[in-house]
From Swiss-Prot:
ATP binds at G33, D34, N35, G36, Q37, G38, K39, T40. The keyword Cell inner membrane does not apply. It is found in: Cytoplasm. Belongs to the RecF family. It comes from the Bacteria. This is DNA replication and repair protein RecF. The gene is recF. Pfam families: SMC_N. The RecF protein is involved in DNA metabolism; it is required for DNA replication and normal SOS inducibility. RecF binds preferentially to single-stranded, linear DNA. It also seems to bind ATP. One of its GO terms (cellular component) is cytoplasm. It comes from Tropheryma whipplei (strain Twist) (Whipple's bacillus).
Length: 363
């Protein structure tokens, strides 16, 4: 095994898995099975180890097997520092428990231990969904490159909740405006760090998105993310104060910035075809991987790449182009329902009703 690979995972009461122990190899790991058997659940569990949660839900309850109170994911990660043991306990009634090598850890510790990128049917929301999907895409990249930024985002969220609570209290009774000014100033300071981080990222990200789009589509095109944010947040809050007090909510800041994606200068969300939208979404994910590969300080050398039932949504040309990009990575995990796919695999696994079996095939 080489750097940053998952060699083993144990699942207990995760989704439809009661208990399952699964080993992986480097190269291409193919996971076959009919719909509803647990392929996506397995992909989700692997991605969960990267510190960015589930790509399907923000809630813990759906992750826990029906009738149980807790789910567990544990894994062995092969890194340049040797084998790292990662554990995540997922609970209905309390915060998740995170451990690295047996020691209590934070999310940023997971980000530094295991890097993983997942391609899934939900990726179409990067193009067709609301701006929140694209904001999260940018913010996840920022936190991957600089795990300490997780603290900035957490502080921003806490400050936002405090400010919203204060705004609501204005509606019920007269509160001191200087207290609102204090929370506003704190929100502006944290928000500015996020806005500037996004601007720096877009400068290096957009050329990559255009390059990958042109490669996947087979035609020269310009694709770019465009972020509309306030140039002076403190002035914006002054203008919005009366309205914010009336509505009891913060109406400006990076959590509300409009992030749009343009294809040849046209808004892709409303004007791109299904094929163009998928190509854009894939280009965004491939650009993320390229950035991670360039950040040798953290990712040495490749992230683990998961393709969860993505090929089923692509035509043969785009499928071939995507395969050329990702099958050369150190470790790729592909789920599929198609038994006719003839990939050169290091390992083929079959999933049936929450049980995983090895076909012991070598490509």
């Amino acid at each position: 095994m080489q750097n940053n690979l998952i060699s083993h995972i144990n699942l207990r009461n995760f989704r439809n898995y009661e208990y399952q122990s699964i080993s992986f190899t480097d190269g291409l790991n193919l996971i076959r099975g009919d719909n509803g058997q647990g392929k996506t659940n397995l992909a989700e569990a692997i991605y969960f180890l990267s510190g960015f949660g589930s790509h399907r839900t923000y809630k813990n309850q759906p992750l826990i097997k029906s009738g149980e109170q807790k789910a567990e994911i544990s894994a062995k990660i092969q890194s340049k520092y040797g084998t790292r043991n990662v554990y995540i306990g997922i609970s209905c009634n309390s915060n998740n428990i995170l451990k690295v090598d047996g020691k209590p850890s934070k999310l940023r510790d997971l980000v530094s231990v295991f890097s993983c990128v997942i391609f899934s049917p939900e990726d179409i929301d990067l193009v067709k969904g609301d701006p929140g999907h694209r904001r999260k895409y940018l913010d996840d990249i920022i936190c991957r490159a600089r795990p300490m930024m997780l603290d900035i985002y957490s502080a921003y969220d806490r400050t936002l909740k405090q400010r919203n609570s204060l705004l609501k209290s204005f509606r019920k009774s007269s509160c001191k405006s200087d207290l609102l000014d204090i929370w506003t100033q704190k929100l502006v300071e944290l928000g500015l760090e996020i806005v500037n981080a996004r601007k720096r990222l877009l400068k290096i990200l957009n050329p990559k998105i255009s390059e990958f789009y042109s490669k996947l589509a087979g035609v020269s095109s310009t694709a770019e993310l465009f972020c509309q944010s306030s140039d002076c947040l403190i002035d914006t809050f002054d203008l919005l104060r009366d309205r914010e007090i009336e509505e009891g909510v913060t109406l400006a800041g990076p959590h509300r910035d409009n992030v749009d994606i343009l294809l040849n200068s046209c808004p892709a969300r409303s004007q791109s075809s299904q094929g163009e939208s998928w190509t854009l979404a894939l280009s965004m994910k491939l650009s993320l991987i390229e950035l991670m590969r360039e950040t040798k300080r953290l990712y040495d050398p490749d992230p683990v790449v998961i393709l969860d039932d993505v090929f089923a949504h692509l035509d043969s040309y785009r499928k071939q182009k995507l395969a050329q990009e990702v099958f050369s990575y150190e470790q790729t995990i592909v789920t599929t329902t198609d038994n006719s796919d003839n990939y050169r695999t290091s390992q083929t696994l079959v999933v049936e009703e929450g049980k995983v079996f090895s076909e012991n095939k070598k490509g």
